[in-house]
Amino acid sequence: MIKYLSVIYFLFSSILFSDTTIVALNQVHHSFGGLGNNRTTTSEIQFPNSSTDYSSITMRVNLECPTGGCDPWDRKAKISVYHIDQWIEIGRYVTPYGVECGWEIDVTDYRSLLQGAVILKSFIDTWVQPGWLVSIEFDFVEGQSEYPFTIVRNLWNYDRLVYGDPTIPVDISTIQEYLPNDTEEAYIRITTTGHGQGNTENAAEFSDKRHDILINGEVSHVHNFWRPDCEFNDCSPQNGTWQYDRAGFCPGDKVDAQNLSILDFSLPGNTVEFDYVLEDYFNQCSPNNPSCVNGVTCTSCAYNNTGHTEPFYYIGSQLIIHTTNKHSNADVYLSISDQDTSISSVDIYLENYVSVYGVSFKLDLSLLEIQGDGNLSFEDGVSGRAEESNWTVSTNAEGLIVALAQGTGEPIQPGEGILTRIQLNLENVSIVSGFLKIIDVEASGYFGSQLSFETGEPTIFELLRTNEELITPTKITLHNAYPNPFNPFTTISYD
């Protein structure tokens, strides 16, 4: 019997959690010219509803030549997904010089983004009509993952960060993020590639520079992203100068992101400050350099479309956090904590990765059944992180809740815990049951900037309002006991 049950369980598990391949794009033409601007394509892709039951996720990218041949030049390209009001890069590559190639990219760390209906964007920086035929597939391999729950937070993302020009100063923002208490592993995932040539030191494509990553004001990592192995590229032979080593990439290859651990520099439950500082560099060949002399300082002081182009960096990065429990990727996460039926109140839980300067939301009562002659209403919020930050939490009869810093009130710093407790007024209400959920959220950051948010699932809400009038019985009936041949008598004690 045990053997048969094991076989049934195995078959059932195989049906539920089998390997899955999702075809995202199938020979989609990326081009520019007479066919229009098709350098970017977006599609809605249906991924598995949950990705926690897969041990790994691999993205396979394949480039083919359309009729007339491939783009003869190497072009930067990336793949992104739209998640909670922002694009997140999940893979990058550089096309080969005029030949077909393909690559596999491990995207397991993006599992929280690759579930349900997702908008995917594929971009190739091509400027010619032949372009490329792009196919993208995702292979989900069933099994137990080392880290089934992963948070993804965007850090520095610049499509064109000009390098070495004092008239266009580099301004890479300092970023603060919060590490939840149940963090198991955390690292910066960064992808930097250099572009532009014919400049001082042939920057930024052919210049080996090292940049600093600072954690809490101290240098934690020296970012060495130079590719010294382009001549050994599997996508060979190609046309062009594919053998030459470059800053962060090789033509005809995927761009490998680097994972830089941070738990040696900050512990879970704390806010971390990140900085990315570029190595000092001055491009004497810039047309913005008044001291540049053609044929003396450099071959040419003017940028052109051939051998002298502006040096810049193409930067994409995220904070990857592996946790014991499921978390949101949004700036702000609001939910209703497990209800204590012994008290007539609702605790609102807040998890925020960034500082919050104001928040409003509504408690939706439409899914509640209220019995009695009265109405359910709310009192202003008390205690919790809001009170600790000298905030006021106001409510109205419709369930709207507004929490703001007042006077000397400070923003609520990144962290997790109870935001506030909302007391319920239950006069002439006997029973409240059903579902309670948070809707219509607005969250503000510094100077009123809009923060992204997610809310928890509707919470089962059951509350029995008892008082002496309600519990006094008006009629008592005693029925026969259910027949029991082993104990035909029933005794009911009464005090």
Task: Spell out what each predicted region is.
Residues 46, 139, 176-178, 261, ...:
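Generic structural detector for well-ordered beta-strands
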Residues 59-61, 190, 348-350, 490-495:
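Aromatic/hydrophobic beta-strand junction motif of beta-rich domains
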Residues 6-18:
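Hydrophobic h-region of N-terminal signal peptides that target proteins for export
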Residues 19-328:
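Extracellular/secretory-pathway and virion-surface proteins
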Residues 1-5:
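Positively charged n-region of N-terminal signal peptides that target proteins for export
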